[in-house]
Each structure stands twice: as structure tokens, then as C-alpha cells.
């Protein structure tokens, strides 16, 4: 269900660190990056309506269900997640794969991002697959933070109310009326970009 984060990840982070904590401060090529030298969280910035700030609403990884030896987490807004003590998780991007680390340094891997489905995470005693699918896109002019892309696209994310008993607003990828989850009403979704917010040391 949980895997211990290898020290090599942190060694890599130190090796790659260049004194900057956000991509907008980098003087390197603006090409998307598959590895970041810092831990971060995600926030969803509405791209269709004005926002109260330049980061958007904070996102969390919440427990969806467990099976023997494994746990599934799902990405939703902090405000809609009913269990506020659950999960204090920081994220890492290494080689195009996303990892979530809890306060005990156990980790979860982001599952394959599929059109019409929510952004999920898996932890397993048997190890969970790492999927090379994510990149960090440099902050656009006028924005402070980089954005997260999947399969090279950072404009296909949406926040959708699921309509389930908990009433969570979850992150979906490239959702449409043709491929939506049965509990999601697509017209109630709105487009967002996922902002990468560095975690202070």
C-alpha cells in the first residue's frame, strides 16, 4: 500500500537544484521539464472565470478506496474533500512520473492519465507503475507559477462535481459528453490549469 521513497530521489533533487524554487525564475530553455528539483503541491486555476488569486484553489490527494495490498487516491479540491486531516501529501516530478509523498515519506505514483477519467494515484506493497506522461510547462507571461501538462497538454484539465455522496470536486482529464464518468455531468465542469506551487523548505 505504501512504498518508502528512495534516497536517490532526494539526491537527484539536490543535484538539480539551481537556487530557484519556481520555473518562472529559470533562465534555462523554456522547453517543458520532466524533472523538477523541488517538492510541490497543485492548485486548480479557473480558465473561464475570474479567480480570487493567481494560484487557484488548492488540491489534495484523498483516499478513494483500498484493496488488499493497495490504495487508490483521487485528486480533488481541498474545500470539497470531507476529511481535512487526510492526506498531507507533497508531490514530486521525476523523469515524467509524478509521485506523492506523505509526512512519513511513503509514496504513491500517479496512475495513467486517460481522457474522461479522474486523476488518480496508486500505492501498493507490490510496487505501483511509474508512468512517463507529465511535464512542467514554464509560467505564461503574467503568471507566477508553472503548470502541469499530461501527454504534452496543459489545457485539458477540468474540475467536475462528481455527484457522489461526498460531493467532491475532482480533477478530470480531457472530459467530454462522449467519454465522461457516469456520475459526472459535463456541463457542470469547468476548465482549469493545474498550477505547480513549490513547497517551502
Task: Pin down the residues of each PLM region.
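Short non-domain terminal segments
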Residues: 1, 7-8, 13, 38, ...
Amino acid at each position: 500500500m505504501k512504498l518508502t521513497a528512495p534516497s536517490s530521489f532526494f539526491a537527484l533533487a539536490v543535484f538539480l537544484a539551481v537556487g530557484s524554487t519556481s520555473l518562472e525564475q529559470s533562465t534555462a530553455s523554456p522547453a517543458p521539464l520532466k524533472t523538477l528539483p523541488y517538492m510541490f503541491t497543485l492548485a486548480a486555476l479557473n480558465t473561464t472565470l475570474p479567480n480570487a488569486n493567481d494560484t487557484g484553489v488548492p488540491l489534495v490527494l484523498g483516499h478513494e478506496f483500498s484493496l488488499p495490498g493497495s490504495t487508490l487516491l483521487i485528486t480533488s479540491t481541498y474545500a470539497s474533500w470531507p476529511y481535512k486531516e487526510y492526506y498531507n501529501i507533497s508531490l514530486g516530478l521525476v523523469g515524467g512520473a509524478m509521485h506523492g509523498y506523505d509526512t512519513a515519506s511513503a509514496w504513491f505514483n500517479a496512475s495513467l492519465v486517460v481522457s474522461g477519467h479522474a486523476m488518480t494515484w496508486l500505492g501498493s506493497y507490490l510496487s505501483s507503475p511509474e508512468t512517463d506522461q507529465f511535464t512542467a510547462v514554464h509560467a505564461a507571461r503574467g503568471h507566477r507559477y508553472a503548470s502541469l501538462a499530461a501527454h504534452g497538454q496543459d489545457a485539458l484539465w477540468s474540475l467536475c462535481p462528481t455527484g457522489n455522496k461526498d460531493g467532491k470536486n475532482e480533477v478530470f482529464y480531457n472530459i467530454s459528453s462522449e467519454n465522461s464518468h457516469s456520475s459526472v455531468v459535463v456541463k457542470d465542469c469547468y476548465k482549469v490549469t493545474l498550477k505547480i506551487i513549490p513547497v517551502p523548505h
